[in-house]
């Protein structure tokens, strides 16, 4: 028996490791533009407002792609859809490295916007895909930690790739970032096909592990069970309306929008803030981004562990999820303190504190695994992500305007800090009890 228990614990961690690597790459590719932004804007003559719009191109497409992406996942399963996703987003990233061959600034701006838009479209199934795979491979009591791990890949990406990209810009040129990061992704897309299967179709899974996952509430077919395609197709607007009229779900959605305002500040304007406002070199900025990212990473893992531990200690799911979220968001507001300090060290310290908090409170995906109606996990994840990433449209553009009208980042940081407060209030006052949402079926 000891042998089976020892070996029934392996395969799902390999799957999780793969998701983690791909998600790191996903965020690395999102961040390429922010690291290249300072030299690029100088070389190509792009102003703050325009750059804000180019930064937002990714999120426009990412948001538009959420619902169709969720639908594709529910129809074809994560393995195939995700492969196409990785391959395409990497290809478009490589092409961005050639955008400067179009001569005139106007043409370059259009090409940049279009290519970033395509990267966003291609990346849109990634997180709902992660969610589908984790729901398939992990029993409920391990899901918070599993979701926290793939979620924290976003910070890990910065820890690894930001110094590397800063170095590339300093040593080679800004185009090289896109070629190398994109090339890496194309290679990884084929590795993905070798590694990822659903639990029922996995070539080397131990039956004991499969039973363990199944008994613990894992949805082991991973959207590949052909018999329930009949039920799956009929997603109506009435269903979406039901999801949006739930006070609990709406609170979770709005909070996610606010939490992501911090994420998108970090993914777009943060390196520019360090270079232009705080006068660091690009290389320094690449390394300076590591500390906040590392803190976000640690916070993210801790938040998931604390939350799952509270559930094991028989606290309610509501308490176990909300406590880390509310504490974390409270810490996030410290981003505003950066306006009142001058030394590089102090700035990095308060940014790091804010990101530790944001990571610790980023349990949105775990909460979604707890509340999404069984019939519509892909779609609920898509809606959740739609709200979350609308922040990626709003934040870069608004901050672009704030910088261009006030000439500094002060109000930008206040704008971001206020969002942490709103998210906190959503969980405190609006969400209520966290439980699985029951669809009222139109049939009966």
Predicted regions and their residues:
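Extracytoplasmic gate region of multi-pass secondary transporters
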Residues: 33-37, 241-301, 361, 365, ...
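C-terminal ends and interior cores of transmembrane alpha-helices
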Residues: 87-105, 330-342
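Juxtamembrane intracellular "pre-TM" segments in multi-pass secondary transporters
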Residues: 2-8, 201-251, 277
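Cytoplasmic helix-loop-helix junction between adjacent transmembrane helices
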Residues: 115-155
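Central cavity-lining transmembrane alpha-helices of secondary-active solute carriers
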Residues: 56-71, 290-303
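C-terminal transmembrane helical hairpin of 12-TM major facilitator-type secondary transporters
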Residues: 318-364
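Hydrophobic core of transmembrane alpha-helices in multi-pass small-molecule transporters
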Residues: 92, 107-124, 345-359
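Helix-loop-helix hairpin linking two adjacent transmembrane segments in secondary transporters
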Residues: 150-203
């Amino acid at each position: 028996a000891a042998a089976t228990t020892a070996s029934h614990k392996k395969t799902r961690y390999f799957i999780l490791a793969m998701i983690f690597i791909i998600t790191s790459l996903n965020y690395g590719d999102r961040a390429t533009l922010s690291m290249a932004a300072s030299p690029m804007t100088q070389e190509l003559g792009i102003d703050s407002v325009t750059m804000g719009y180019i930064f937002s191109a990714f999120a426009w497409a990412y948001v538009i792609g959420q619902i169709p992406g969720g639908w594709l996942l529910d129809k074809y399963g994560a393995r195939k859809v995700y492969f196409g996703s990785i391959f395409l987003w990497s290809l478009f990233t490589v092409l961005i490295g050639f955008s400067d061959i179009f001569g005139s600034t106007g043409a370059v701006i259009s090409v940049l916007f279009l290519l970033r838009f395509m990267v966003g479209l291609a990346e849109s199934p990634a997180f709902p895909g992660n969610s589908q795979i984790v729901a398939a491979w992990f029993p409920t009591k391990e899901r918070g930690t599993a979701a926290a791990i793939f979620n924290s890949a976003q910070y890990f990406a910065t820890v690894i790739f930001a110094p590397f990209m800063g170095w590339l810009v300093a040593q080679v040129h800004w185009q090289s970032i896109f070629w190398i990061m994109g090339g890496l992704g194309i290679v990884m897309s084929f590795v993905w096909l070798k590694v990822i299967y659903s639990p029922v179709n996995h070539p080397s899974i131990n039956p004991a592990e499969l039973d363990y996952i199944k008994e613990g509430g894992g949805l082991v077919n991973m959207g590949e069970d052909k018999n329930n395609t009949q039920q799956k197709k009929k997603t109506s607007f009435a269903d979406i309306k039901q999801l949006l009229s739930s006070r609990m779900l709406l609170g979770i959605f709005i909070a996610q929008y606010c939490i992501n305002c911090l994420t998108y500040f970090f993914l777009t304007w943060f390196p520019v803030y360090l270079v232009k406002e705080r006068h660091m070199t690009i290389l320094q900025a690449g390394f300076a981004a590591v500390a906040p990212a590392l803190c976000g990473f640690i916070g993210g893992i801790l938040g998931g562990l604390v939350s799952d531990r509270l559930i094991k200690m028989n606290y309610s799911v509501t308490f176990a999820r909300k406590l880390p979220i509310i504490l974390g968001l409270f810490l996030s507001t410290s981003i505003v303190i950066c306006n009142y300090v001058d030394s590089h060290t102090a700035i990095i310290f308060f940014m790091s504190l804010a990101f530790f908090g944001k990571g610790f409170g980023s349990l949105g995906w775990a909460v979604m695994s707890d509340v999404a109606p069984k019939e519509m996990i892909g779609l609920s994840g898509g809606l959740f992500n739609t709200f979350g990433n609308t922040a990626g449209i709003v934040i870069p553009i608004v901050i672009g305007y704030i910088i261009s009208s006030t000439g500094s980042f002060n109000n930008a940081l206040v704008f971001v800090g206020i969002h942490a407060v709103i998210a906190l209030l959503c969980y405190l006052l609006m969400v209520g009890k966290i439980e699985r949402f029951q669809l009222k079926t139109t049939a009966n």
